[in-house]
Regions:
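Bacterial N-terminal signal peptides that target proteins for export
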Residues: 2-10
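Flexible, polar/low-complexity N-terminal or interdomain linker segments that lie immediately upstream
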Residues: 10-82
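Second-shell loop/turn segments in exported
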Residues: 42-49, 99-106, 130-135
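Active-site neighborhoods of enzymes that stabilize oxyanions during catalysis
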Residues: 43, 169-175
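Positively charged, proline/Ser/Thr-rich regional signature most characteristic
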Residues: 59-126, 175
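Short, solvent-exposed loop/turn and secondary-structure capping segments
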Residues: 81-83, 141-143, 168-169
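Catalytic cysteine-centered active loop of the rhodanese-like fold, especially the PTP/DSP P-loop
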Residues: 110-165
Length: 175
């Protein structure tokens, strides 16, 4: 299995490549944007204390029947209700937050820390997988970092989120 640093670098490069879709034709500008995305993802991962998974790794774990808690951090009506990774539970977080923000500043809506912990479960050694829409969306970072602060030991973020999941041709569920 890859080291956390290797996994972070690999995921950063993969994730950043998804971000290039909207970049200009100038290869130098594209490289600057790729670098910014890669560094931001690496910094968030390091600051949050969680690990990264690709959608392919998540799908493999799901296919093997591994017991995972999968959390979709996108808004219920606009996203989760329409499509989500099969088996995922929903708890919406905000896109942007700062270190030290309190709970009400990182959660979208009226969800409480107790409700989020109830979704994650009492077993803090069980793998928790958190995703949002795409690499630049910070919702999954906010949720993963919070789960780590609550003592969950195997917290994973899928940076490509539902866009990468669909891009890989994997099935989605809807409410």
């Amino acid at each position: 299995m890859m080291t956390l640093r290797s996994r972070t670098l690999l995921a950063s490069l993969i994730a950043a490549s998804f971000a290039l879709g909207g970049c200009g034709d100038n290869q130098f500008e594209q490289e600057v944007k790729l670098e910014q995305s890669a560094v931001q993802l690496a910094q968030e991962t390091q600051q949050g204390g969680y690990q990264l998974l690709t959608v392919a790794e998540l799908k493999t774990r799901m296919d093997k029947g591994e017991e995972l808690v999968i959390i979709d951090t996108m808004p219920y009506e606009d996203s989760y209700k329409k499509e989500h990774i099969p088996g995922a539970k929903n708890f919406a977080f905000v896109k942007e937050a700062k270190a030290g923000d309190n709970w009400s500043e990182i959660v979208e809506g009226s969800g409480t820390p107790e409700q989020f912990q109830a979704l994650l479960g009492e077993d803090k050694s069980r793998p928790v997988v958190i995703y949002c829409g795409f690499v630049k969306c910070g919702r999954s970072h906010n949720a993963a970092a919070w789960a780590v602060t609550q003592g969950y030991q195997q917290v994973y973020r899928v940076p490509g989120g539902i866009f990468a999941w669909k891009g890989a041709g994997y099935p989605v569920s809807a409410e």
